[in-house]
Amino acid sequence: MQRSPLEKANVFSKLFFSWTRPILKKGFRRRLELSDIYQIPSCNSADHLSEKLEREWDRELASKKKPKLINALRRCFFWRFVFHGIILYLGEVTKAVQPLLLGRIIASYDPDNKAERSIAIYLGIGLCLLFIVRTLLLHPAIFGLHHMGMQMRIALFSLIYKKTLKLSSRVLDKISTGQLISLLSNNLNKFDEGLALAHFVWIAPLQVVLLMGLLWDLLQASAFCGLAFLVVLALFQAWLGQMMMKYRERRAGKINERLVITSEMIDNIQSVKAYCWEEAMETMIENLRQTELKLTRKTAYVRYFNSSAFFFSGFFVVFLAVLPYALIKGIILRKIFTTISFCIVLRMAVTRQFPWAVQTWYDSLGAINKIQDFLQKEEYKTLEYNLTTTDVMMENITAFWDEGFGDLFIKVKQSNSDGKIPNGDHGLFFSNFSLLGTPVLKNISFKIEKGQLLAVAGSTGAGKTSLLMLIMGELEPSEGKIKHSGRISFCSQFSWIMPGTIKENIIFGVSYDEYRYRSVIKACQLEEEISKFAEKDNTILGEGGITLSGGQRARISLARAIYKDADLYLLDSPFGYLDVLTEKEIFESCVCKLMANKTRILITSKMEHLKKADKILILHEGSCYFYGAFSELQSLRPDFSSKLMGFDSFDQFSADRRSSILTETLRRFSIEGDAAVSWNEGKMQSFKQTGDFGERRKNSVLSPLNSNRKFSVVQKGQQQMNGIEENDDEPLERRLSLVPDSEQGEAILPRSNMINTGPTFQGRNRRQSVLNLMTRPSVHQGQGMYRTGNAAVRKMSMVPQSQLSEIDIYSRRLSRDSGMDISDEINEEDLKEWFFDDVENIPAVTTWNTYLRYITVHKSLIFVLIWCLVIFLVEVGASLVGLWVLKETSLKDKANTTNNTYAVIITNTSKYYLFYIYVGVADTFFALGLLRGLPLVHTLISVSKILHHKMLCSVLKAPMSTFSTLKAGGILNRFSKDIAILDDLLPLTIFDFVQLILIVVGALIVVSVLQPYIFLATVPVIIAFIMLRAYFLQTSQQLKQLESEARTPIFTHLVTSLKGLWTLRAFGRQPYFETLFHKALNLHTANWFLYMSTLRWFQMRIEIIFVTFFCIVTFISILTTGDGEGRVGILLTLAMNIMSTLQWAVNSSIDVDSLMRSVSRVFKFIDMPSEEPLPPKPTKSKKNQLSQVLIIENEHVKKENWPSGGQMTVKDLTAKYIDGGNAVLENISFSISSGQRVGLLGRTGSGKSTLLAAFLRLLNTQGDIQIDGVSWDSVPLQQWRKAFGVIPQKVFIFSGTFRKNLDPYGQWSDHELWKVADEVGLKSVIEQFPGKLDFVLVDAGCVLSHGHKQLICLARSVLSKAKILLLDEPSAHLDPITYQIIRRALKNAFADCTVILSEHRIEAMLECQRFLVIEESKVRQYESIQKLVTEKRLYGQAISHSDRMKLFPHRNSSRHKSRAKITALKEETEEEVQETRL
């Protein structure tokens, strides 16, 4: 970054913002880069500001029992705030003085007041000077207040972040990530936007008092008639604001429904295409869109009338103020024009400035109180350690995550005779109820000496991770003692990668030791992976390590923990994402050899690890089930395996037991309004559900940490359009709304871009507390259905290295992986996409082509615009005719002039006043929009409807290769933020711009006709305005975009820190991350400060141009007007009106250009390539001579009920994810017989899922695949995919009923659906729910276990009558019971079908008749598993002893003595950990 010219700027340069000229020139000539941005002044640095506020806050905490954050802010910023307020008031006072001089100038042209004619020129000079003084005072004052608001935001940002790193884990469980983001974005934005408005809470009343005093002098008591009208108008606007809130609340629920479905569709676009559900999803989303648009139009109309009320009030307030006085006493023309000028200022003060100020104070004080409450929450307490201690010891430890019993726990406990609830992920949603009010750890005691390995085992939710948290100090014991040295290293269960290089992630701030570093890399088997990267270990990893596979991330996390030299190493299931072979090698080389002399506590579920441990601790429901050596375990606890596997699943309970659990669980659903649950005498009577299934429940029953708080299946449709707040004490919408959100802020005030302003929605998954964020896997770590090698296509996103900037390393690492609009709760995987926006290939300024294309989307829009222009021409024409009539009348009056010196309202001169009434009435009709505004707003919303439909169709038809280059968040932003702009902001902004620009043009025409000389001044002014706007816009839009990009790292860094908070604390890296956060803040500040400064430069230049114009008009009017106070009055009044209106029009034009960028982005998506059927290959075969007709309607397919057998032939298949990318599979050929069951094997990332995707034509493929002799080139794409049944690894359950999820097209009867549900073992599950098939699933089927979701996918395949079934690792997250159900269903329902099963566990493939092994992009075939195991020893090592005995019975002796069977503990899977407590 360059040094800022501000540092060396003189007073005048600072006053006129001339120091910004270099960046404006640079931005006009070429595209700006981050390196062009100036460094921030030291007074704006986050370090300086945070230290200042933190010192005052600490002082406040120390001195008072009830500390107030506002006191700390007052001590930091009060006097500057007062100083700028006084300057702002002096600038506003000039507005009240201007009408006095205007009145004197008009009076000087009275025929009977020739004495003052000589001083008219001096009065004109005075009037011009007032405008100059106002310009010189207002702009520095407003900029100073914005600058101070920015500094307050920065200081509070830092304070909140530092507090977040100190929060206790208990508090983190009660705060969602969405609330933290809301705290840092919505609430703090109020300082940026509103501080300049805050002073009007006292300036506006003073203005009103001053103006009413001046009006009393003119009109006496009748002046209060105008004020009364304005007060009524303000109340009317407040009422309209409340009405709009109601519409918005209702509409927010509908938007939420649509966006939830859209989000689910985008996230699962592979599944949508695989199931051929494009039309079904389009229909569902469009139906929701229709309902939403009805409310959108109502909201727009209310906002339109609210906006219009300000315009039409001008005429009425003058009319009501003047008419009573004129009827009683008569009135002279001077008083009329003076009153008009006074009322313009009075109207702004009463209807705009004061309501805005009150709203600003209400919102700001509310934000300060929220931040104050947050800053006083309980902090993490560092335990006292003894550095000389070598042992690790616990004595009778008991600990709670959260005290207090919930009603649900009590009732569930009463319904269970032994008071114990099974603890695994084998039921619907009832796991861990027993942990609700009970200790997470009970009476735990153990002792391990230096150098020993303690293996901790237990079922999911037994308290294993809680044990490590206790040792780290994250969980405070309520009883007992802990003893260790305090020198700890920690490896989280779910790998955490910070933005940075591979080396930085491993070293993590510890001093670099080359030998140790190389040893750790080698032990963690990272050498080979690192060597493949072009930059080796200096390769930059995006947030979360998106470019790495799950196994690579796990190994880097493990390497980080081992590299640190510590006394005690806590390893929380570090091998969860490694294949069996890699896990075995790393355990040996790393845990057993490299760390042999260190004390280690390893959480594991593997029998091999237990055998090699010095001590074993097995936990069950928080208690010590066993502690000792492995030799003791076999003799003392022979049943430990079956006990901890948790076979007591939901499906094995009695019907009464299941009904009881389900009843109690559903009873906790907080259903609002008509979505209530009624229960009668313990039996489910009814369960009404509205269509608002998109409204997601707030909390998860599955998380016992959250289970004492209510959640809802269908929330009330309250939504905060501009935020993501959740507060139990107040509704999502603010309680006070004097002005609608779109109306807040004067036109000259910049809008902060710290958060997107589109409507937000509740995302795809259940509410995430911060603790859940830390204790659940990153979404990257799920093995996606379609992935390849190291380039995981996760959410269709990749981060090309070439996109990374060269300036701010940390910021560039953070900013590239983010995006997505979510509402009141934002989920962890959505946060990184929350602030992302796709801006590539979008020009800095909206092109004329975009405007033209937008206008021609809807034919009616062209006619409406022509209609608006016709009405405008009629108005201007009528005004000119009126002027001509008045002029003619005036000439006649001069010839018959009388000695009447008392110009009452019925005099000839009052004809000018009648003309003003005429113009006012015309403007009133214009403002009301009876002929112009409403049709325009209505048509623009229709345009938005069409664009949404076109974009939805385009996205659904786009090939998967397109999605591999787009982010899910970027796509969803088009449907959320950009469509919201098209719905809400753009119609009203275009209306305002059209209205304002026509008012200005009309006024200019009238002024020019009244005084033709003025027209000569008008032309250069208009040219100067157009050139200046074009000059500024080119730079400002680029600065705005750079600011938007710089905003991303702030929030991404917060989420990254939260995800790795336990690791940060264990390594003591909080100061380092605070420094990185300040760096991200400073980067954003540099962009935002420069944008504010250039905007003020532009606003000031615009005002200087029109002050010049007003001076010219004033002097021309004074010098060329003879006897005729009417004409000079009209000229000067209209010129002053132009002054106040034109700047508003200029800002509206900039807003329109900025909002039209959303239209550009939407058009970019509409223009995406379409997924087309592959062209047929030229061949001599008769069946392929139908050319294009063959693709549309294949006769062979139609007549023979294709496919009839399911025989597949693959010839020379090559698959790539993107055009020009590396081939994942190359020249693969094999054949599969009809009805054969084929196993697909390979290590993680070898291409198993890729091959399944290639079968479905989801990738860029070459070669040929035939089904029953029919080539894929000769079959329509949809029909080809319908030949396959699919059970993807990433299960797709969308928000809707069971019926919709099974049969979205509504093709099957209830009898068929129940029959299939029974076949796959779903019937008993569905019957438990009220409404049965019509029960609405929300939040991706959150009330179902992963196994039940897999069964739904299986049922879809059965209903599809497919002859070929593709299964992508179906056993990955299943409990044994559900897996047995799937195996049974496969045998029965798909007995005569071809089954292709992708697995990396050989145990799951014992029943396959044939095997395909993928290695190095090639496929090898094996006819039997015995042959596979014999030839591939690596796979043989992965088979358990019991399975080996089944495969090779001849090798086993019957003379072996039987002994107690010991099997491995059930592996904890990603889904289980998500749905259970620590």
Curated annotation (Swiss-Prot):
It is an enzyme of class 5 (isomerase). Its EC number is 5.6.1.6. There is a cross-link at K688 (Glycyl lysine isopeptide (Lys-Gly) (interchain with G-Cter in ubiquitin)). GO terms for molecular function: ABC-type transporter activity; ATP binding; ATP hydrolysis activity; bicarbonate transmembrane transporter activity; chloride channel activity; chloride channel inhibitor activity; chloride transmembrane transporter activity; intracellularly ATP-gated chloride channel activity. Residues 1384-1478 are annotated as: Interaction with GORASP2. Coiled coil: none annotated. It catalyses: ATP + H2O + closed Cl(-) channel = ADP + phosphate + open Cl(-) channel; chloride(in) = chloride(out); hydrogencarbonate(in) = hydrogencarbonate(out); ATP + H2O = ADP + phosphate + H(+). GO terms for cellular component: apical plasma membrane; chloride channel complex; cytosol; early endosome; early endosome membrane; endoplasmic reticulum membrane; membrane; nucleus. The chain crosses the membrane at residues 78-98, 123-146, 196-216, 223-243, 299-319, 340-358, 861-881, 918-938, 990-1010, 1013-1033, 1095-1115, 1130-1150. Residues 654-833 are annotated as: Disordered R region. Residues 99-122, 217-222, 320-339, 882-917, 1011-1012, 1116-1129 are extracellular. Residues 423-646, 1208-1441 form the ABC transporter domain. A motif (PDZ-binding) lies at residues 1476-1478. InterPro entries: AAA+_ATPase, ABC1_TM_dom, ABC1_TM_sf, ABC_transporter-like_ATP-bd, ABC_transporter-like_CS, ABC_transporter_C-like, CFTR/ABCC7, CFTR1_ATP-bd_dom1. Residues 1447-1460 have a biased composition (Basic residues). Epithelial ion channel that plays an important role in the regulation of epithelial ion and water transport and fluid homeostasis. Mediates the transport of chloride ions across the cell membrane. Possesses an intrinsic ATPase activity and utilizes ATP to gate its channel; the passive flow of anions through the channel is gated by cycles of ATP binding and hydrolysis by the ATP-binding domains. The ion channel is also permeable to HCO(3)(-); selectivity depends on the extracellular chloride concentration. Belongs to the ABC transporter superfamily. ABCC family. CFTR transporter (TC 3.A.1.202) subfamily. Monomer; does not require oligomerization for channel activity. May form oligomers in the membrane. Interacts with SLC26A3, SLC26A6 and NHERF1. Interacts with SHANK2. Interacts with MYO6. Interacts (via C-terminus) with GOPC (via PDZ domain); this promotes CFTR internalization and thereby decreases channel activity. Interacts with SLC4A7 through NHERF1. Found in a complex with MYO5B and RAB11A. Interacts with ANO1. Interacts with SLC26A8. Interacts with AHCYL1; the interaction increases CFTR activity. Interacts with CSE1L. Binds and hydrolyzes ATP via the two cytoplasmic ABC transporter nucleotide-binding domains. The two ATP-binding domains interact with each other, forming a head-to-tail dimer. Normal ATPase activity requires interaction between the two domains. The first ABC transporter nucleotide-binding domain has no ATPase activity by itself. The PDZ-binding motif mediates interactions with GOPC and with the SLC4A7, NHERF1/EBP50 complex. This is Cystic fibrosis transmembrane conductance regulator.
